Amino acid sequence: MNKREIARYIDQTNLKPYATKEDIIKLCDEAIEYGFYAVCVNPYRVKLAKDYLREKNADVKVASVIGFPLGATPTEVKVFEAKRALEDGADELDMVINIGALKDKDYEYVKNDIAEVVKVAHERGAKVKVIIETCYLTEEEKVKACELAKEAGADFVKTSTGFGTGGATVEDVRLMRKVVGPEMGVKAAGGIRTYEQALEMIEAGANRIGTSSGVKIVEGAPDE
């Protein structure tokens, strides 16, 4: 997989709480230069990223995060956050599942929590990725989380926030792909810093990579 091809898998990410305006502009410039699929930024920075990319006439989507990084806010709060991010120009929303509710086996709540965000996103033509935060889940819970995300109409399942105790693993990506089937997206995120790691995730079934190391990944890829 060459530089140009792997770049289209990448959501170049800066979710640091202390990211400045300058940092976000740099992120957008990298996305333009390397041809990344999207930039992923905190909700407060969506408008800045969208306006800048639009001004540059760039073919780069803007993703943002909802209920991040804990997933423990009430559904109404996630919906409000989603609406605001969409108004500011987000094309994709990476929302965190309610992990505690999943562990309580309150599956109706978990599914509805996702479905409500999906509803507002799809009304505006935006996609939703559901972060299941694999590092906190048993195998059984990972399977259930993927099933609920699929039933709720989400577009992707995603491994990790990058703020938990662990990131993406090849095993988790493979399992998630097996559960959701070919028609849904799988995003691997958390700890992916090299071309080799990214390629492993893609071979395991990921069709999106979330990373703050997109430049390093592309530079490690063959030219052709």
Swiss-Prot record:
Provide GO CC annotations from the record.
cytoplasm
State its location(s).
Cytoplasm
Where do the catalytic residues lie? D94 (proton donor/acceptor), K158 (schiff-base intermediate with acetaldehyde), K187 (proton donor/acceptor)
GO MF, one example: deoxyribose-phosphate aldolase activity
Q: How is its activity regulated?
A: Activated by citrate. Inhibited by NaBH(4). Activity is independent of divalent metal cations.
One record GO biological process: 2-deoxyribose 1-phosphate catabolic process
Influence of pH: Optimum pH is 4.0.
- Where is it predominantly found? cytoplasm
Record's catalysed reaction(s): 2-deoxy-D-ribose 5-phosphate = D-glyceraldehyde 3-phosphate + acetaldehyde
Can you list the disulfide-bonded cysteine pairs?
none
Instruction: Report the temperature dependence from the record.
Output: Optimum temperature is 95 degrees Celsius.
Top EC class per UniProt?
lyase
Which Enzyme Commission number(s) are on file for it?
A: 4.1.2.4
Record flagged with keyword Lyase: yes
Matching entries from InterPro entries are given as: Aldolase_TIM (IPR013785), DeoC (IPR011343), DeoC/FbaB/LacD_aldolase (IPR002915), DeoC_typeI (IPR028581)
Keyword rRNA-binding belongs to the record: no
Known Pfam families for this protein? DeoC (PF01791)
Keywords for the protein's UniProt record, in alphabetical order? Cytoplasm, Lyase, Schiff base
The record's similarity note reads: Belongs to the DeoC/FbaB aldolase family. DeoC type 1 subfamily.
- Quaternary structure note: Homodimer.
NCBIfam families, per the entry: deoC
Q: What function is annotated for this protein?
A: Catalyzes a reversible aldol reaction between acetaldehyde and D-glyceraldehyde 3-phosphate to generate 2-deoxy-D-ribose 5-phosphate. Could be involved in pentose biosynthesis.
The protein's name: Deoxyribose-phosphate aldolase
Name of the gene this protein is made from = deoC
